[in-house]
Amino acid sequence: MEAEGSAQNSLASLRKAAEAKVYGAEFDVQMTADGIVVVNHDNTIGSTAISRATYEQIKDSKLKNGETLPTLQAYLEEGRKLKDLQLILEIKKNKNKEHEDQAVKTIVKMVKDMGMEKQTEYISFSLNVCEQLVKATGGASEIFYINGDLSPQEAKAKGFTGIDYNFKVFDQHPEWVEEAHRCGLKVN
């Protein structure tokens, strides 16, 4: 949902989510080739792949509302002011496992250094990212797998705290909601 004056993954949309008193605001992160984490839904900005670009190459990119592309640091700083809002941080899938692994380490360290572990929940379509999150957080964070290809028992066995599957997955496996609850998983 876009509110007037905001754009997907913008600081304005984060503030508007808090004003609306919703549970949380979901946002997407990508890491540049030089290790800077930016908040952006797509893997590209124009024709430039974020994971292959340096931050310098993309830092002046504008969102639809005119805001400059936010870094994760800036987004977390804004989110920290909004104490009643959960930050639902989606780490985007990358074809390169090493890039995913480094992104997880960088992101978890930043969240921890800012003291925002309780305000931040992680989601990803990448099984590797979720597995790395369990290792990096010691299982102390909310980690939701969203790809839809694991049963609740499999997700629980990997240390995830929840599943956040498309409704079509639950249409195919209606028993999974009850199974997830029996396993102690959260379902979104």
Predicted regions and their residues:
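Phosphate-group recognition and catalysis centered on beta-loop-alpha active-site segments
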Residues: 1-188
